[in-house]
Amino acid sequence: MTEIVAVRGREILDSRGNPTLEVEVVTAAGFVGRAAVPSGASTGQNEAVELRDGEGGRYGGKGVLRAVANVEGELAEAVVGMDVTDQRALDLAMIEADGTENKGRLGANAMLGVSLAAARAAAEYAGLPLYRYLGGPGAHVLPVPCANILNGGAHAANNVDFQEFMVVPVGFESYREALRAVAEIYAALKKLLAERGLAGGIGDEGGFAPDLSSNGEALGLLSEAVERSGYSLGEQVCFALDPAASEFYEGGRYELSGEGRSLERGEMVDYYVRLCGEYPIISIEDGLAEDDWEGWEMISARLGGRVQLVGDDLFVTNPKILRKGIERGIANSILVKVNQIGTLTETFETMDLAHKSGYTAMVSHRSGETDDTTIADLAVAVNAGQIKTGAPARGERVAKYNQLLRIEESLGEAAVYPGLGAFNPRMREG
């Protein structure tokens, strides 16, 4: 009944209108799991390889028919006949079939599609929601949403250097109430931008993307939107940043072109320290470039005791790279993107290493998304306590938020909303 009998792939579109991969895994008993693979705009140089066709004419070379062929060819050969409930064996079989360190031969997108679809088929067989199948009886913590409601950098066509400005609803009793606060702040920000005559267009992740004079101005707008919504800044709602600093790191300096400034690493760290003194910032992701480990050591020494420092491009959901960071004492949290590593098994291994080492983990979407809601279930399955999946706008973002509402409802009184407690313990002890 649990034997895999077929694996199918197809090319679909993501939220940016680019092709991506969807995979179905079918069992002998007729259970079907379907999963769609996301894609990023700002990517770490050590991420597992996303296989694209590279043909100049078709979709500008971004087609995924090669990945589809690999799903239905070598990867199907590797897993057909296997037990769909043996996730680790399935994933290891695909890793062995690929035979490369970065999954560049068959494609991390192809492998991830099979990995996630198999998990969904197994959950269907077990008659369990995905979060319960993956996490077991202990899965009960709803994640705090880090909602990107102002976009810049690679996610928007504006002059703002930092990529994401997020509101974080920490002072609420339930996920439902926290999400309501995010939606109300988003609406207040929309009205505020209109009053100021600032463009109301939105970026890839649903946040507004106005031209602003500085990153500080963006935080000022968020502050006013929070206060207009009737919430207490610093108590009920805090901020998180994702500068995506690798995107503006050139020649050993941080080029804040929107502000007309060029900073060395020490000055960049000073800049963050100043912002954290002016605003209730509890998390900074990729504040330094992924290859500026000296800069990461500096910011970890200066802010690591009171601010969550998240490695995204720095760690790329890779346990080997994370282990190096732990040994050097840099960052205190990891962003988890399943397509950075390419299988569910390796994702769990990375998160387990993080938690055992005192690092928190924030489960994340990508800028190129679909209506697939796997990451919502994943966040609850591992009791991550944090999720980043964009603004409360655009269907592919709202799909994840709404899935979490359903999960909270299904958990009933067992559901826990951790608030500030989800963020790095060392930060709170500092």
Swiss-Prot record:
Entry GO terms, CC: cell surface; extracellular region; phosphopyruvate hydratase complex
GO MF annotation terms: magnesium ion binding; phosphopyruvate hydratase activity
Cofactor: binding comment: Binds a second Mg(2+) ion via substrate during catalysis.
UniProt-annotated catalytic positions: 205, 337
Pfam family, one: Enolase_N
Transmembrane segments: none
Any one of the GO BP annotations: glycolytic process
Coiled-coil intervals, chain numbering: none
InterPro entries: Enolase, Enolase-like_C_sf, Enolase-like_N, Enolase_C, Enolase_CS, Enolase_N
Residues the entry annotates as binding (2R)-2-phosphoglycerate: 163, 337, 366-367, 388
Chief location of this protein within or outside the cell: cytoplasm
Catalytic activity: (2R)-2-phosphoglycerate = phosphoenolpyruvate + H2O
Positions annotated to bind Mg(2+): 242, 285, 312
Listed EC numbers: 4.2.1.11
NCBIfam families given in the database record: eno
Family: Belongs to the enolase family.
Name by which UniProt lists this protein: Enolase
Gene this chain is encoded by: eno
